[in-house]
Design a protein with these regions (language model features):
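Residue-level marker for beta-strand->alpha-helix junctions and adjacent short loops that shape enzyme
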Residues: 8, 50, 76-77
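Alpha/beta-hydrolase fold nucleophile elbow
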Residues: 36-54
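Short beta-strand immediately N-terminal to the catalytic nucleophile in serine-hydrolase-like folds
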Residues: 45-47, 72, 187
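Short beta-strand/loop motif that positions the catalytic acidic residue
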Residues: 180, 186-188
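Cap/lid segment of the alpha/beta-hydrolase catalytic domain
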Residues: 1-35, 81-85, 89-91
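Conserved alpha/beta-hydrolase "acid-adjacent" motif
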Residues: 193-199
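Accessory cap/linker subdomain of secreted extracellular hydrolases
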Residues: 60-62, 68-179
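Short, hydrophobic alpha-helix immediately C-terminal to the catalytic nucleophile
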Residues: 27, 56-60, 199
Length: 199
């Protein structure tokens, strides 16, 4: 068992840019693990939600030593099905995912004074407690919590790409299906928000 943090999260250095680094980083991680003296050279992956997404992207990289994946409760199209639904920005999901799951670690890493950190922390707490007032903030690009590009800078980048374009194409798993030959056990839930991508 080898836990790995994606770039810019937890113990890994760098900047987190959801999905965009996981293809190359997934390839490198799988092949590194396969070369270790304690490894038999056969690598498998498992995980839920974003960790499922990293598996699909590693499989799309065609890492030769990736033998199987077990993605659970994750999407396969990170434009339509994760960030947007039918062209509509998934505001409530993106606010909570960006702020609660990712924002607190971003804020902890940032070099900010207490005066600068205070309003951002209050904004994260507000989204975590009752995110509905934030969903009514217009324009959605200017939600105060994301104003300084310290917390989840990708949030604004996603809004800058409201249609499927060159930003989304390299990370669309559905388009990569013909080149994925890694066996996969795909687990979903009927009431999971990513069920379309699972099916």
């Amino acid at each position: 068992f080898l836990p790995a943090d994606v770039r810019g999260r937890f113990e890994s250095e760098g900047q987190f840019k959801p999905f965009h680094q996981e293809l190359d980083d997934g390839f490198d991680t799988v092949e590194w693990a396969a070369r270790q003296p304690w490894s038999n050279g056969r690598v498998g992956m498992y995980g839920i939600s974003y960790l499922g997404a990293t598996q699909w992207l590693a499989a799309a990289s065609q890492a030769p030593n990736l033998q199987a994946i077990f993605p659970s409760l994750t999407g396969s199209d990170f434009y339509d099905g994760w960030t947007y639904q039918g062209g509509a920005f998934e505001l409530a999901f993106n606010l909570t995912w960006s702020a609660i799951l990712l924002g607190m670690p971003d804020l902890a890493r940032a070099s900010l004074s207490a005066v600068e950190r205070g309003p951002l922390l209050a904004g994260l707490a507000a989204i975590g407690g009752d995110h509905w007032p934030m969903t009514r903030h217009l324009p959605v690009r200017d939600v105060p919590t994301f104003a300084h590009d310290v917390v989840a800078p990708f949030y604004k980048e996603w809004l800058e790409h409201p249609t499927r374009d060159a930003f989304w194409e390299p990370i669309t798993i559905e388009a990569a299906h013909p080149r994925i030959h890694t066996p996969a056990y795909n687990l979903g839930g009927w009431f999971d928000l990513f069920i379309r991508g699972t099916l």
